[in-house]
Amino acid sequence: DFLYGGDERYRLCQEVILGIGGIAMLRALGYAELRVFHMNEGHSALATLALMEEQAGSLPDRTYTELEVNAVRRRCVFTTHTPVPAGHDRFNADLVAQVLGKQRADALARLSVMDGALNMTELALRFSGFVNGVSLRHGEISRAMFPNYTIAAITNGVHAATWASAPFAELYDRVLPDWRRDNCYLRYAVDIPLAIIRQTHLAAKRELLNHVRWLTGVQLDDKVFTLGFARRATGYKRGD
């Protein structure tokens, strides 16, 4: 299996497994009383259809009631990350019927989320009670892309203790002992002498180059300025 590179049918099948299969997996594991489902990107949006089917008690040949729709909305939260239209999956209605079956395709049509094609982001937006982008600017862009929805902004962050390299974590432990408990203490890193920062950076760089050598057999020179790009090589990631 592979994440990227398949055709449209392959991609839709992946998203069926993630969304509908994800809900089925949680139920099989005994998680029957979950109160909130958080979807990241539209790839998992079919989870809303699975929850709608649960709410109705079956896959009905009727329009879902407002009560059923609102019950699903109260339980779904959606985060959109992608600021360009190409990042929002759309699947032709005929393909949706082939993969999901006519009954489910008709249900999606009655939910007004399929007009010739199923827009996965639109599906997630329509049936989530709270939606957010991942920065103030991205929130603005998302509201412009999807003007019919209320989209908040929550700035992305990282878990500092996980992302700090071992040499820097050891340095912070020495000079900023509370940084793991409260990341705000990292603001005082500006007072660390530059010579110590450089020494720690070189230690981290050597660890990275040793890891590259272990993985590939290639020995890079630690005296050469080196840039890494830990993302997919796609235009909107702004590798330039």
What is each residue range found by the language model?
Residues 1-240:
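Catalytic cores of carbohydrate-active enzymes across secretory and cytosolic contexts
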